[in-house]
Amino acid sequence: MIKQALISVSDKTGIVDFAKSLSDLGVKLLSTGGTAKLLADAGLPVTEVADYTGFPEMLDGRVKTLHPKVHGGILARRDLPEHMQALEQHDIPTIDLLVVNLYPFVATIAKDDCTLADAIENIDIGGPTMLRSAAKNHRDVTVVVDPADYAVVLDEMKANGNAIGYATNFRLATKVFAHTAQYDGAITNYLTSLTDELQHASRSAYPATLNMAFDKVQDLRYGENPHQSAAFYRDLAAPAGALANYRQLQGKELSYNNIADSDAAWECVKTFDVPACVIIKHANPCGVAVGNDSADAYAKAFQTDPTSAFGGIIAFNREVDEAAAQAVAKQFVEVLIAPSFSDAAKQVFAAKQNVRLLEIALGDGHNAFDLKRVGGGLLVQSLDSKNVQPSELRVVTKRQPSAKEMDDLLFAWRVAKYVKSNAIVFCGNGMTLGVGAGQMSRVDSARIASIKAQNAGLTLAGSAVASDAFFPFRDGLDVVVAAGATCVIQPGGSMRDDEVIAAADEHGIAMILTGVRHFRH
């Protein structure tokens, strides 16, 4: 039974109402510093920890709760007579409920004007110590680190005469250890990122020790293949607009491959400023287009490769309305992603309950790192978020691209970044015409992209081509020109750039170098 609670929080969301409810249930309240003042100002009967222990706060508040009368009351096992006798001998009442959250270290170091001294002062000592003590003794003590659990605790107390069951205490204790691990991980990441100057402004992007925290969203039926087990975890620092923030409106459970392909589709489509549609199959775009609205963009994207689009993942960067929904509903689709779906669109898919509809708010946030596991290690790099500015583009051929060709080239370049290397992408009039992906030689990707367009009945005459990396020889260029391309955009940087540029001039096409490579593996 909970008779006494100690409350000390930095995040004061809902704390006054929670404390009032505890007081109404007859629970004695202990508190510290600003939290105690807040509760007292709200008219609640609260005892300062300094008065409770008989020892004042000291060292600018660094020492407040590090006292036997606090930790003895938390750590004592109620089932051990010798523990209870020790409490009685030293006049230490039990503390049955601990409500603590920590100094805002992560928020502090995120500030541009943060100094190392600011960071150090926001490393909580007493809070984690109390939390770990209470979590260790969760058999007898309820510990709350998340304001979202206030209502859960109150409901159970009211239903059980101020008592909390073991299952709830255990769950809350595991949240504490996850929270303190994340907190210590953030401190370690920060301190080990400091360079020799030991200044906040001179931090390295890659700390000497890397700690990351993820919460499990769900177990998955299986992994990439049926014999593999899998689960999906959400980054606790997931940025705005990230796939992990999806809301599923209908459909079967997402699979491992659904999630991976959905991420590829969403990351690509949200880079466009105008209505766009991206169709993904096996992590590669098989159709990308912009249009007047979602329905128009989908119709164009689907034309690129109707065969591969079967059972694909489709993403939009605008609301899916009834017209777009009716067009998509004619095909077999695994997942449909958009910032929103109109009520009429939802009605269209109500009859297709296996189709997974995901809503994700548009946002331009990116993961802090791109990660790739290797045997016994982890490759960590910054995101490939480089957008080439017009001033960085170099026309290296005698012929300049026309305004239309320039638009087509920039569209193709945007798409090529999301195609597995080696990537060749034919585009025209705001849509992909042929995509060659994942080949060991660039010339084979060029041939495949050309064949794909041919199979779809699309003409490549006057098309624009993007290559994610340089042409090592002129053969790839010869293939795309023979297919009908009149302009090419590529990074450049080959030992044979001069030979490739000369070939472009020989063919009378325009070529632009970006100076940026977009390998994707």
UniProtKB/Swiss-Prot annotation:
Keywords for the protein's UniProt record, in alphabetical order: Hydrolase, Multifunctional enzyme, Purine biosynthesis, Transferase
Entry's EC annotation: 2.1.2.3, 3.5.4.10
Keyword Transferase among UniProt keywords: yes
Catalytic activity, reaction form: (6R)-10-formyltetrahydrofolate + 5-amino-1-(5-phospho-beta-D-ribosyl)imidazole-4-carboxamide = 5-formamido-1-(5-phospho-D-ribosyl)imidazole-4-carboxamide + (6S)-5,6,7,8-tetrahydrofolate; IMP + H2O = 5-formamido-1-(5-phospho-D-ribosyl)imidazole-4-carboxamide
Residue intervals of the MGS-like domain: 1-145
Covalent S-S links between cysteines: none
Pathway given in the UniProt record: Purine metabolism; IMP biosynthesis via de novo pathway; 5-formamido-1-(5-phospho-D-ribosyl)imidazole-4-carboxamide from 5-amino-1-(5-phospho-D-ribosyl)imidazole-4-carboxamide (10-formyl THF route): step 1/1; Purine metabolism; IMP biosynthesis via de novo pathway; IMP from 5-formamido-1-(5-phospho-D-ribosyl)imidazole-4-carboxamide: step 1/1
CDD domains for this protein: IMPCH
Superkingdom of origin organism: Bacteria
Coiled coil: none
GO biological process: 'de novo' IMP biosynthetic process
Gene Ontology cellular-component terms listed: cytosol
Single Gene Ontology MF annotation: phosphoribosylaminoimidazolecarboxamide formyltransferase activity
InterPro entries: AICAR_Tfase_dup_dom_sf, Cytidine_deaminase-like, MGS-like_dom, MGS-like_dom_sf, PurH-like
Note on domains (UniProt): The IMP cyclohydrolase activity resides in the N-terminal region.
Entries under PANTHER family matching the protein: BIFUNCTIONAL PURINE BIOSYNTHESIS PROTEIN ATIC, BIFUNCTIONAL PURINE BIOSYNTHESIS PROTEIN PURH
Family designation: Belongs to the PurH family.
HAMAP family xrefs: PurH
Protein's name according to its UniProt entry: Bifunctional purine biosynthesis protein PurH
